[in-house]
Amino acid sequence: MSRVAKCPIVIPSGVNVQLDLQDISIKGKYGHLSRTIHQSVKIEFLNNQIIFSPRLGFSNGWAQAGTSRALVNSMIIGVSEKFSKKLQLSGVGYRVSITKDNIINMSLGYSHIITYHLPKGINAENLSPTEIIIQGIDKQLVGQIAANLRSYRTPEPYKGKGIRYSNEVVRIKEAKKK
């Protein structure tokens, strides 16, 4: 059994936390996030720490408390530091560019250019024609957008062409021999 919920979250300086029953809102240097916590979780705010514990009468209380603690911890990290995912394009003619109004244009070997509109709160930075960084305060949204962009051309196992995460290792298969 995981014991994530038993460890309290220490709130760093510059982060403001407000509790209202099951609603928690966090303000930091980079923005504001809010979330409703599951009803089986009791939240306490003591000595600049947030403590999660299960309420009586719920069978999944500890599981929900651990999940809630992890979600709130990622919210605190997001508003104070930001999350980022780096994507690399590998393949002949594969290019990426970003317009001023947060639209990503990708040339991925299709007959047309793929355009992707970034939602509010997410920024993209073009390091080179084949590298892009997705940044934002919401960890789930940053990861989902990076996965959506990667899904347009996932790395194939024979030559490794496609869009990959910067830390991803694509295992190359050997070609069929006669």
Swiss-Prot record:
GO molecular function: rRNA binding; structural constituent of ribosome
InterPro entries found in the cross-reference section: Ribosomal_uL6-like (IPR000702), Ribosomal_uL6-like_a/b-dom_sf (IPR036789), Ribosomal_uL6_a/b-dom (IPR020040), Ribosomal_uL6_bac-type (IPR019906), Ribosomal_uL6_CS (IPR002358)
Superkingdom: Bacteria
Presence of keyword Coiled coil: no
GO biological process terms held by the UniProt record: cytoplasmic translation
Pfam families associated with the record: Ribosomal_L6 (PF00347)
HAMAP family: Ribosomal_uL6_B
Function: This protein binds to the 23S rRNA, and is important in its secondary structure. It is located near the subunit interface in the base of the L7/L12 stalk, and near the tRNA binding site of the peptidyltransferase center.
Similarity remark: Belongs to the universal ribosomal protein uL6 family.
Name of the protein in its database record: Large ribosomal subunit protein uL6
Source organism per UniProt: Buchnera aphidicola subsp. Acyrthosiphon pisum (strain APS)
